[in-house]
Amino acid sequence: MKTLEKYILFAIVLCCLLQLGQAIKCWDCRSDNDPKCGDPFDNSTLAITDCQQAPELEHLKGVRPTMCRKIRQKVHGEWRYFRSCAYMGEPGIEGDERFCLMRTGSYNIFMEFCTCNSKDGCNSAGIHRLGLMGVLTGTLLSVIVAHLLRQ
């Protein structure tokens, strides 16, 4: 195998591994449809959503979700919770997931917007890990590339 072909193969494998590392799973629910989505959060009847399988948004063509989000909103004295995949922004405030963006408005409206990507399901309430298949796939690809580079 020529040197250029080895570098191209290495780049392809690296891109595949990076894609595996970016995939995150998030809870997807609304408390106005399901009271278990509120706080305290009860995920016993909810399935976690693979954000890589989330539909492309019409107003964000080509943008894929990379984080989870949890929105806590108080409108006219009533609390609402929204949990889903997040397409834009950064985790937490300045990268610190312990902090959320808070906004208040007229008409007794309050909103807390939290984003995270540290682990699957991080939008449940408050270190993204690859699953076993991701680790095995990465290991297998690494062995194959190492073997091909030695030839």
Curated annotation (Swiss-Prot):
GO cellular component: cytoplasm; endomembrane system; side of membrane; vesicle
UniProt propeptide residues: 125-151
InterPro entries membership: QVR-like, Sleep_regulator
Annotated Pfam families: QVR (PF17064)
UniProt keyword annotations, A-Z: Biological rhythms, Disulfide bond, Glycoprotein, GPI-anchor, Lipoprotein, Membrane, Signal, Transmembrane, Transmembrane helix
A GO BP entry: septate junction assembly
Keyword presence, Phosphoprotein: no
Outcome of gene disruption: Embryonic lethal with aberrant tracheal dorsal trunk development resulting in tracheal tube size defects. Compromised epithelial paracellular barrier function in trachea and salivary glands due to reduced and irregular septate junction formation.
Keyword flag Transmembrane helix: yes
Subcellular location: Vesicle; Membrane; Endomembrane system
Lumenal face of the membrane: 24-128
Residue positions with a glycan: 43
Residues spanning the signal sequence: 1-23
Chain ranges on the Cytoplasmic side, renumbered to this chain: 150-151
Disulfide links within the chain: 26-68, 29-37, 51-85, 100-114, 116-122
Lipid attachment, kind GPI-anchor amidated serine: 124
Residue stretches spanning the membrane: 129-149
Chief place of localization: other
Membrane topology: Lipid-anchor; GPI-anchor
Known function: Required for septate junction assembly, possibly by organizing the preassembly and transport of septate junction proteins including dlg1/disks large 1 and Nrx-IV/Neurexin-IV. Involved in paracellular barrier functions of trachea, hindgut and salivary gland mediated by epithelial cell septate junctions.
Other facts: The name crooked reflects the excessively long and convoluted tracheal dorsal trunk phenotype of mutant larvae. Should not be mistaken for the proteins crooked legs (crol) or crooked neck (crn).
Family recorded in the similarity comment: Belongs to the quiver family.
Name the record gives this protein: UPAR/Ly6 domain-containing protein crok
